[in-house]
Amino acid sequence: PSATPIPATTPTVKPIGSSSAVSTVNSSIPVLREVAIPGYSGILVESLDGKIVMENLSSLNYNPASNVKIATSYAVLKTFGPEFRFPTGVWTDGSFDPTSGTLYGNVYISGKDPSFNLEHGVSISNELNRLGIRSVTGDLVVTDNFIMNYSTNPQRAAATLQASLDAGKRNATINKSWQSYLLNSGKVGQVSNVPSVSFTGGVYVQQIPSNAKMLFTHESAPMKEIVKAMMCYSNNYLSERLGDMLGGAFAVSRIVQQNTGVPANEFYLATSSGLGMNRVSPRAMMKLLKVFRNDLGKMKMTFNDIMPVAGMDK
């Protein structure tokens, strides 16, 4: 047999592009003009005063992948502000016996905080304990828009919430999340007992009845911290949920177009995370970055506050 591979007459994968440069580079720096950029690659580098350092096919549209999250971050901060917090309401239709620590009735949870996670369920249990409540004779009920632990299935989220509320049902993952939360928030030593609330009823997805009374509201971290976490981990789930708060990818596109002046034919999104077929030109992305930087300054923030910084963030 021949030692030289022979190409198949009908290859499974066929090249559709070329690694050869298809255009010359526009640059204010002579040595950069000699750089051969392969294929159809869009590049635009500008100095802070707006001078072009390097440019190549910057008006063509490309799939920006996770750079879409920059647009989503801009849109949610522009709409809600950096200090916005998602509320999660805790309600009841029952009565409380302080001598036994028993709540006779149901507990209802409302809210659609996309960052609501395992440790936040334990935090609600801790707050119920602070009110003296340690057992509930009724059901645990969540509304149909309740989100927990990156699950949009409300029934699954409700079951996860019940497991995080009751110390007897918690697994090692929930306990680890709670301990990490105490450590990172500087609250180690402030919670003397293990938070726990037991339920004798079931777990359901229903609306909150009109006779229910609010016990308290749990608030998320500020929007700027949620955006920072989303960007550091390039979290597709968080990015999609934040985009949903605005009306989806189309709404994110419109907010960017209206506030930056980029034309619709150079900036259109199918998703809020970067998954799927999105199309953005380097020129449009540069306009977004400039406007975003300016708006962050008005919020007394910089890109460091909402994007990962190498060697500093983990």
Per-range role (PLM):
Residues 2-61, 124-131:
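Beta-lactamase-like hydrolase cores
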Residues 53-54, 117-121, 149-152, 252, ...:
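Extracytoplasmic/secreted cell-surface and envelope-processing proteins
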Residues 38-40, 48, 57-59, 65-68, ...:
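Extracytoplasmic
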Residues 78-93, 299-304:
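Short, well-structured active-site flanking segments
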Residues 89-158:
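Active-site-adjacent, His/Asp/Glu-enriched structural segments that form or flank metal-binding
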Residues 135-136, 146, 156-310:
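A small/polar active-site loop signature that marks catalytic segments
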Residues 50, 64-82, 140, 230:
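Active-site SXXK
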Residues 47-49, 58-60, 72, 90-96, ...:
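A mature extracytoplasmic/lumenal domain signature
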